[in-house]
Design a protein with these regions (language model features):
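N-terminal cysteine/histidine-rich coordination modules
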Residues: 1-76
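Long, contiguous alpha-helical scaffold regions
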Residues: 64-184
């Protein structure tokens, strides 16, 4: 809803270009931009000279009214204590996302009705468990949940490949019970 032009420099050939982008995205009005965030194409461009992909990040506020959450998308060094004043709707869950690869996962967690803080702790526990078994995950991401089966699924990438791992819902509930209440 608020357009800007982002200056881009190709890391491959040094070509300088720009891309129009938004600093405020309301998913109700711009569902195509939400899709670009999920597809990880919103914060990227193609160099007109060498055709390589250019990744970038600029401060952006994403508001999802249906699921009642707000993502403050910005690099860690750009985050300020007053950012929460930008959108003061108390009923919304507010989260910082400082990496474009985390946007999709954070959206999925919040839209599935989970607390992303508890999921992050579950991922850390899973990482430690796998390391004890001499497995060395490169990446662990939230995948999905089966509430009727009482399990939360994670995609675990290792140097050998990829596998799905389920964690019992009781672990999530136990973690959630010890976390401080999220006052949004």
């Amino acid at each position: 809803m608020k357009s800007i032009y982002v200056a881009l420099t190709c890391r491959n050939c040094g070509y300088q270009t720009h891309k129009q982008s938004e600093t405020l995205i309301l998913s109700d009005f711009e569902p195509y931009l939400k899709k670009q965030l999920i597809d990880e194409t919103y914060f990227s461009a193609i160099c007109p000279c060498c055709k390589n992909k250019i990744d970038f990040l600029h401060p952006c506020l994403f508001v999802e009214k249906k699921y009642r959450y707000i993502l403050f998308i910005k690099a860690k060094h750009d985050q300020k204590a007053t950012d929460h004043l930008l959108y003061q709707e108390k009923a919304y869950c507010k989260r910082y996302v400082d990496n474009t690869t985390k946007i999709k996962e954070t959206m999925k967690i919040l839209e599935d009705g989970y607390d992303d803080r508890a999921i992050a702790i579950m991922k850390l526990k899973l990482l430690l468990h796998l390391r004890k078994q001499e497995k060395h995950p490169v990446c662990i991401t939230y995948f999905d949940s089966e509430k009727e089966q009482s399990s939360i699924w994670f995609k675990v990438k290792t140097e050998e490949g990829e596998e799905m791992m389920a964690v019992h819902m009781q672990i999530y509930d136990n973690i959630l019970n010890i976390l401080p209440k999220d006052d949004h």
